[in-house]
């Protein structure tokens, strides 16, 4: 429960993030959830309905208590950092639009993130997944949708959000897909015939009519398919076939990059295909590839036995 004036500020802030800062819909939603979590904690902390004055006078002890609460609630370091960034962003917005100046929150540093290397699947696990994902749909068009989507992600290295944004217009180019990724950065990815053919087969039996600009991957009720729904299909697959715990839609993007690297692709090309802003992000895949080689060496090299 929020004070009306605060809710109005939040609504204006969300429009600012969307229209002026060009944040993705996913980021706006995440930031909004983080801010509401902060305000709910402030409600509890002050034992009364939060007002704009509470927000302006929030002290460092309250903010640190909120961060500690998120840590106790098993939020990841990344989620805690994002939450603090969201609240700082809101306070910056208040500086622009109200009389708030130099709030103490800007002196608080985000917790250091643990750098996790991307986890790829083995090529065998990818093959098993692609061969059997059709078994989890109960309806023919859903089964074909699942396979087309998974093949597209692995064949093109797309993020799940990017894959779910594919429209009929993307299919009109016979050679390339134009993708708008993070930060509204455009990249061009070659169409693999197997992915395009599966999508075409899926669209032929899809029971819903779509306009050229509508996302082609649909849920059972005809609405745009959401990432959690597809990941639930992958959970069923993972459990039945005893596949790795880290198998998610995103792990197929990691696998795309790792397998290209293992088969001789250069880092710059992989960077372009993934849409990474920095080469250092792509270089993480060299570390996972080295770990893969070490594992092979340890288990298979004759002199070690």
From Swiss-Prot:
<dbReference type="InterPro" id="IPR002104">
    <property type="entry name" value="Integrase_catalytic"/>
</dbReference>
<comment type="similarity">
    <text>Belongs to the 'phage' integrase family. XerC subfamily.</text>
</comment>
<feature type="active site">
    <location>
        <position position="159"/>
    </location>
</feature>
<dbReference type="InterPro" id="IPR010998">
    <property type="entry name" value="Integrase_recombinase_N"/>
</dbReference>
<keyword id="KW-0132">Cell division</keyword>
<feature type="domain" description="Core-binding (CB)">
    <location>
        <begin position="4"/>
        <end position="95"/>
    </location>
</feature>
<dbReference type="GO" id="GO:0006313">
    <property type="term" value="P:DNA transposition"/>
</dbReference>
<comment type="function">
    <text>Site-specific tyrosine recombinase, which acts by catalyzing the cutting and rejoining of the recombining DNA molecules. The XerC-XerD complex is essential to convert dimers of the bacterial chromosome into monomers to permit their segregation at cell division. It also contributes to the segregational stability of plasmids.</text>
</comment>
<keyword id="KW-0238">DNA-binding</keyword>
<feature type="domain" description="Tyr recombinase">
    <location>
        <begin position="116"/>
        <end position="298"/>
    </location>
</feature>
<protein>
    <recommendedName>
        <fullName>Tyrosine recombinase XerC</fullName>
    </recommendedName>
</protein>
<dbReference type="InterPro" id="IPR023009">
    <property type="entry name" value="Tyrosine_recombinase_XerC/XerD"/>
</dbReference>
<dbReference type="GO" id="GO:0007059">
    <property type="term" value="P:chromosome segregation"/>
</dbReference>
<keyword id="KW-0131">Cell cycle</keyword>
<dbReference type="GO" id="GO:0009037">
    <property type="term" value="F:tyrosine-based site-specific recombinase activity"/>
</dbReference>
<dbReference type="InterPro" id="IPR050090">
    <property type="entry name" value="Tyrosine_recombinase_XerCD"/>
</dbReference>
<dbReference type="Pfam" id="PF02899">
    <property type="entry name" value="Phage_int_SAM_1"/>
</dbReference>
<keyword id="KW-0233">DNA recombination</keyword>
<dbReference type="Pfam" id="PF00589">
    <property type="entry name" value="Phage_integrase"/>
</dbReference>
<dbReference type="GO" id="GO:0005737">
    <property type="term" value="C:cytoplasm"/>
</dbReference>
<keyword id="KW-0963">Cytoplasm</keyword>
<feature type="active site">
    <location>
        <position position="182"/>
    </location>
</feature>
<dbReference type="GO" id="GO:0003677">
    <property type="term" value="F:DNA binding"/>
</dbReference>
<comment type="subunit">
    <text>Forms a cyclic heterotetrameric complex composed of two molecules of XerC and two molecules of XerD.</text>
</comment>
<feature type="active site" description="O-(3'-phospho-DNA)-tyrosine intermediate">
    <location>
        <position position="285"/>
    </location>
</feature>
<dbReference type="InterPro" id="IPR044068">
    <property type="entry name" value="CB"/>
</dbReference>
<dbReference type="InterPro" id="IPR004107">
    <property type="entry name" value="Integrase_SAM-like_N"/>
</dbReference>
<keyword id="KW-0229">DNA integration</keyword>
<feature type="active site">
    <location>
        <position position="250"/>
    </location>
</feature>
<dbReference type="GO" id="GO:0051301">
    <property type="term" value="P:cell division"/>
</dbReference>
<feature type="active site">
    <location>
        <position position="276"/>
    </location>
</feature>
<feature type="active site">
    <location>
        <position position="253"/>
    </location>
</feature>
<dbReference type="InterPro" id="IPR011010">
    <property type="entry name" value="DNA_brk_join_enz"/>
</dbReference>
<keyword id="KW-0159">Chromosome partition</keyword>
<dbReference type="InterPro" id="IPR013762">
    <property type="entry name" value="Integrase-like_cat_sf"/>
</dbReference>
């Amino acid at each position: 429960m929020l004070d009306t004036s605060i809710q109005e500020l939040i609504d204006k802030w969300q429009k600012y993030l969307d229209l002026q800062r060009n944040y993705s819909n996913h980021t706006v939603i995440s930031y909004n959830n983080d801010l509401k979590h902060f305000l709910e904690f402030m409600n509890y902390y002050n034992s009364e309905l939060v007002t704009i004055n509470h927000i302006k006078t929030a002290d460092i002890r309250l903010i640190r208590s909120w961060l500690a609460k998120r840590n106790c609630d098993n939020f990841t370091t990344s989620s805690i950092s994002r939450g603090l960034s969201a609240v700082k962003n809101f306070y910056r917005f208040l500086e622009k639009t109200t009389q708030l100046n130099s709030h103490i929150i800007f002196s608080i540093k985000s917790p250091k993130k643990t750098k996790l290397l991307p986890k790829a699947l083995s090529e065998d696990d990818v093959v098993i997944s692609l061969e059997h994902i059709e078994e989890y749909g109960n309806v023919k068009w859903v089964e074909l949708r699942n396979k087309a989507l998974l093949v597209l992600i692995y064949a093109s290295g797309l993020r799940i959000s990017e894959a779910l944004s594919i429209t009929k217009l993307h299919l009109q180019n016979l050679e390339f897909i134009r993708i708008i990724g993070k930060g509204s950065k455009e990249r061009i990815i070659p169409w693999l015939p197997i992915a395009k053919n599966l999508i075409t087969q899926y669209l032929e039996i899809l029971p819903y009519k779509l306009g050229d600009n509508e996302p082609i991957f649909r849920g059972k009720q005809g609405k745009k398919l959401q990432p959690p729904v597809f990941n639930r299909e992958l959970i069923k697959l993972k459990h039945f076939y005893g596949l790795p715990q880290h198998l998610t839609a995103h792990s197929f993007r990691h696998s795309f990059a790792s397998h290209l690297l293992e088969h001789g692709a250069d880092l710059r090309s992989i960077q372009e295909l993934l849409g990474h802003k920095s080469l250092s992000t792509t270089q993480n895949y060299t570390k996972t590839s080295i770990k893969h080689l070490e594992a092979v060496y340890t288990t298979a090299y004759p002199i070690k036995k």
